[in-house]
Amino acid sequence: MTNVFVKKIILFISTLFLSNLIYAEKLQYFVNESTNQSLRAYTSSYSYQPSSMMDKAIENLPTYSNVKKCATNNVSDAILILKPILSYNAQSTILYGDLNVKIYQTRSKVETNPDNFIKTMKISLWNVVKFDEVTMGYYVNEIYTDLLKKLISDIDNLKINKNHPTNGSYCDLLTTIKE
């Protein structure tokens, strides 16, 4: 009897897992590859490329396992256009992080149609950190990870229409735009 009960529990859990995989949003993300950012504190500075730091933060979060980097041959429910901006206030030792997000979904044959942008949002965080060129990469990754955690809860509340498959050809257009 307990063996049958255990089998039913395993079946129930696997059904939940499979339904979650089937109904989960398939998303792509885009971060402008060409931009570099610098953080400064008095005589020290730290330069980094937001796209590679964002890639690292996304890879470390299991909740983003169904989110792919934007590519022409990918088809998804929507594209997240991420623009992270960090600044450091040396006097108060605060690292400020903003994540500007646009959610794009093909709802018109014209790629640049404003109706294709279904949501725009801004997420902000801050951390008290001591500026150090050696550990600044860790703090940047930490604030990116925290921003992405806040973003996933906002995306879960957003109803993305699965009737508008979005291919990654828009990613090619985004790479040509200088922000």
Identify the meaning behind each predicted range:
Residues S45-S92:
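Short, solvent-exposed, polar/charged sequence segments at loop or secondary-structure edges
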Residues T72-F131:
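Surface-exposed short loop/turn segments
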Residues V4, I9, I13-L16, N20-S65, ...:
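A structural "domain/chain start" motif
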Residues S108-E179:
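C-terminal/domain-edge helix-coil "capping" segments
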